[in-house]
Amino acid sequence: MSTKTIRIATRQSPLAMWQALYVQQKLQQCHPDLEVQLVPMVTQGDVILDTPLAKIGGKGLFVKELELALLEGRADIAVHSMKDVPISFPEGLGLVTICERDDPRDAFVSVKYHSLDELPTGSIVGTSSLRRQCQLRELRPDLIVRDLRGNVGTRLNKLDNGHYDAIILAVAGLKRLKLHERIRTPLTAEQSLPAVGQGAVGIECRLDDQQTQTLLAPLNHYDTEVCVLAERAMNTRLEGGCQVPIGSYAIWQDGKIWLRALVGAPDGSVIIRGERTALPKDACQAGVELAEELLERGAREILTQVYRGNPST
């Protein structure tokens, strides 16, 4: 009997390679006879580094090449950071597995300062995320917030070379790259509500490939799946891309799902927040209802302005 081989499409960045190797290891632990190969590739999002993501199509730029490899049969699965996964998929592809979530928080990273509160007025903080920018500007309107692109190493180098006084990165990414010592302070969800799916790894494959889906099934983490799908349901109802000022974070609490969300103007002048509690079976519906509440309370106007390419910054 021939040994089944699974080919993993992945970006070449260190963090993406960590995620692919993580999935490779998990698959081989569950299926010792399985051969798992990595198919590294460069995406548009990795190449275009001089323009904010919001102006060039958002984080979907990080997955299109991987999806093309799936559709053309050059790979069997694609591994993504869930916060980079768009709300819709090409025909024939779908999200079939969500692995156990790591720490979803944002991290305050600085050479000189230990916390956001310590930053002097006029300090320069780097982040390319509109979600982080709007919350930073609300918390500390006296700071200067500037775009920061590139992989984690590039961003840290820019910080170390004095271009920024502090930068905001994902805790999970720093931990995965064994750079946890660079984290000065994790930001609470109240300070910086995470992105949809932040901290989780998702696996996409062809929907007609039942054999591969069966092999992937043991990697799915139910508790994480319920939370991330609720966050994504909220984002889908908002018609939010991956690079918009939207945050959403769900956790289990006393057997129920507690979902929080926000939509903010990039300048931090207005942030609409809301929350819902629901049974796990109703979590996605709660996400939709929360999105509708936010839209009614002013999120629609904020998103319309952002999508017109005229954020109030």
Curated annotation (Swiss-Prot):
<dbReference type="InterPro" id="IPR022417">
    <property type="entry name" value="Porphobilin_deaminase_N"/>
</dbReference>
<dbReference type="InterPro" id="IPR022419">
    <property type="entry name" value="Porphobilin_deaminase_cofac_BS"/>
</dbReference>
<comment type="subunit">
    <text>Monomer.</text>
</comment>
<comment type="function">
    <text>Tetrapolymerization of the monopyrrole PBG into the hydroxymethylbilane pre-uroporphyrinogen in several discrete steps.</text>
</comment>
<protein>
    <recommendedName>
        <fullName>Porphobilinogen deaminase</fullName>
        <ecNumber>2.5.1.61</ecNumber>
    </recommendedName>
</protein>
<feature type="modified residue" description="S-(dipyrrolylmethanemethyl)cysteine">
    <location>
        <position position="242"/>
    </location>
</feature>
<dbReference type="GO" id="GO:0006782">
    <property type="term" value="P:protoporphyrinogen IX biosynthetic process"/>
</dbReference>
<dbReference type="InterPro" id="IPR022418">
    <property type="entry name" value="Porphobilinogen_deaminase_C"/>
</dbReference>
<comment type="similarity">
    <text>Belongs to the HMBS family.</text>
</comment>
<dbReference type="InterPro" id="IPR036803">
    <property type="entry name" value="Porphobilinogen_deaminase_C_sf"/>
</dbReference>
<dbReference type="InterPro" id="IPR000860">
    <property type="entry name" value="HemC"/>
</dbReference>
<dbReference type="Pfam" id="PF03900">
    <property type="entry name" value="Porphobil_deamC"/>
</dbReference>
<dbReference type="GO" id="GO:0005737">
    <property type="term" value="C:cytoplasm"/>
</dbReference>
<keyword id="KW-0627">Porphyrin biosynthesis</keyword>
<dbReference type="Pfam" id="PF01379">
    <property type="entry name" value="Porphobil_deam"/>
</dbReference>
<comment type="pathway">
    <text>Porphyrin-containing compound metabolism; protoporphyrin-IX biosynthesis; coproporphyrinogen-III from 5-aminolevulinate: step 2/4.</text>
</comment>
<keyword id="KW-0808">Transferase</keyword>
<dbReference type="GO" id="GO:0004418">
    <property type="term" value="F:hydroxymethylbilane synthase activity"/>
</dbReference>
